[in-house]
Each structure stands twice: as C-alpha cells, then as structure tokens.
C-alpha cells in the first residue's frame, strides 16, 4: 500500500493494519525458518509495509 493511501486512514485503521502485518511477518518468518518459504521477497515487502505504517502513525501523533 502506498504511503499516500495510508495517510488517508484513521489511527484505528492503521493500528489494525499494523497488527495484521505483524502477524503476517511472524508467519513468513516461521516459514523461512523451516525452509517452506519459496518467495523470500515477501519478507522484505512486509517489513517495508510495517515501517510505512509506523511512520504514518508517528506523523499523525505529531499533529
């Protein structure tokens, strides 16, 4: 999701998105640890998405 789209969401929606992404990251990390993850680029994408959501939350907290 693009940062501009994230900025239009409310804080509650962003927190829900963050929880969802953290759960997805956990599942991907477990798959990678057991050798089941074929598309390793997903880890990078999820990590980047988490950073984007956290950045937007910090911006909203400063407003």
Swiss-Prot record:
Which Gene3D superfamilies did the record assign?
1.10.287.310
Which keywords does UniProt give here? Answer: Ribonucleoprotein, Ribosomal protein
Biological process, per Gene Ontology: translation
One Pfam family this chain carries? Answer: Ribosomal_L29
**Which Gene Ontology cellular component annotation is one that this UniProt entry carries?**
cytosolic large ribosomal subunit
Alphabetical list of HAMAP family matching this protein: Ribosomal_uL29 (MF_00374)
- Which family does this protein fall into? Belongs to the universal ribosomal protein uL29 family.
Name recorded for this polypeptide:
Large ribosomal subunit protein uL29
Supply the source organism for this entry: Pasteurella multocida (strain Pm70)
The lineage, from the top, is: Bacteria, Pseudomonadati, Pseudomonadota, Gammaproteobacteria, Pasteurellales
């Amino acid at each position: 999701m693009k940062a501009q789209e994230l900025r239009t969401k409310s804080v509650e929606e962003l927190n829900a998105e963050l929880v969802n992404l953290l759960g997805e990251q956990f599942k991907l990390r477990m798959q990678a640890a057991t050798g089941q993850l074929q598309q390793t680029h997903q880890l990078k994408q999820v990590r980047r998405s988490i950073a984007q959501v956290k950045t937007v939350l910090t911006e909203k907290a400063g407003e």
